[in-house]
Design a protein with these regions (language model features):
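TRNA-recognition modules of translation machinery and tRNA-sensing kinases, especially anticodon-binding
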Residues: 2-16, 23, 100-215
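Metal-assisted phosphate- and nucleotidyl-transfer catalytic regions
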Residues: 26-135, 158-171, 175-176
């Protein structure tokens, strides 16, 4: 199932990618608060257990992998991404240890992030990016983007892309792009986890998959 992300935002003039995480935390808090205060009847009808939290804990991708391997005696199969089972296990671990339904996984490998993701200056093999997990499922992806022209060109070349094919995109960097970043969130995924629906198709008005294009 390819879930359309219908909630996106971009931020300019940021200090670092953690500002984006802070705004996302506030946005999720606002959503949960609205459900609690304005849709209590529907929440009760669907037996929804709303999460309660002040802050969302975070863990670096590499550390998350090692924690899962150690805690559950599980061999690391994919060093570049979290498998669905690993998303479930890291969520379970943070629920048990920190009583949190949410967890930010940060610093994903360069190999699994797009050409515009900013590399971590302390470890260029990883990026200043993150996923937000909720009850075992990734519901959002975001991070800091590259704003420097030369750095962006170099990153494109490293990913076997031709900078000439991105001339209009690079013009923005050449003439002044502020430090920026953003996030895309799957509201249907969030809804699926809130109502404990294992299949996200049932929380999408018009789901799309390999066998369904209409309506």
């Amino acid at each position: 199932q390819n879930v359309n992300r219908i909630y996106d935002f971009e931020m300019g003039f940021i200090k670092d990618f953690r500002e984006i995480m802070e705004v996302e935390t506030g946005a999720v808090k606002s959503m949960i608060s609205t459900l609690k205060n304005e849709y209590a009847k529907e929440v009760k009808m669907l037996n929804v257990v709303l999460p309660e939290f002040d802050e969302i804990p975070c863990v670096k991708f590499k550390d998350a992998k090692e924690m899962i391997a150690a805690e559950y005696n599980r061999k690391i199969k994919d060093p570049y991404d979290l498998e669905p089972e690993e998303e479930q296990l890291i969520s379970k671990l943070f629920k048990e240890k920190y009583n949190s339904d949410f967890v930010f996984v940060t610093h994903y490998p360069v190999k699994k992030r797009p050409f515009y993701a900013m590399d971590d200056p302390e470890n260029p093999k990883f990026t200043l990016s993150f996923d937000l997990l909720f009850r075992g499922l990734e519901i959002a992806t975001g991070g800091q983007r590259i704003h420097d022209y030369d750095e962006q060109v170099k990153k494109m070349i490293s990913k076997n892309l031709n900078p000439e094919d991105f001339e209009s995109y690079l013009m923005i960097h050449k003439y002044g792009m502020p430090p920026h970043g953003g996030i895309g969130m799957g509201l249907e995924r969030l809804c699926a986890r809130l109502i404990d629906e294992p299949n996200v198709r049932y929380t999408s008005l018009f789901p799309r998959d390999m066998t369904r294009l209409v309506p």
